[in-house]
Amino acid sequence: LIAVRDVKASSAWYQTLLAAKAAGDPDHPHRLFYDRIMRGDALILQLHRWDDEEHPNLAGPDRGPHGHGVLLWFEVDDFDAAVDRVRRLGARVIQEPHVNPAPQHREIWIQDPDDYVVVLASPDGEARQGLRES
């Protein structure tokens, strides 16, 4: 779960980024301050608006840097398409697509609308062929 300023906007952003869907009734009033991002039956991410309900750790969005030391890491099986979605969203790219030699996969590091660092990575070993050719 991450705290965000605008649940509806963040939900749309992550749905596009991850080729996922929001759970439940899109018109439910609760969706203004909480949403779940799903891929099939799998819960991928929860979003909660800052300063709502009785969650003491979700108060004061400007008290400190958001997500310092936290990476939202998603393995995607469609890495090239995911990079295309990043470009369409106009996301701030921290690190362009590259091969991480340890897990032998490709990664792109970006920032979401609330300044959280998001990493999209292909499955481990996916880039093994390219490493042998270089």
Where are the language model's segments positioned?
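Vicinal oxygen chelate
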Residues: L1-R5, D25, Y34-R39, L58-S134
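N-terminal beta-strand motif that seeds the catalytic metal site of vicinal oxygen chelate
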Residues: L1-S11, A22-A23, G69-F74, A121-S134
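Short beta->alpha connector loops
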Residues: D27-P29, D52, D78, N100-P101
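Core segments of cupin and vicinal oxygen chelate
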Residues: L1-L45, W50
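Membrane-topology and secretion signals of cell-surface/extracellular proteins
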Residues: A42-H55, P65, G69, V118-A127
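A short, polar/proline- and glycine-enriched secondary-structure boundary/capping micro-motif
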Residues: P56-G60, G130-R132
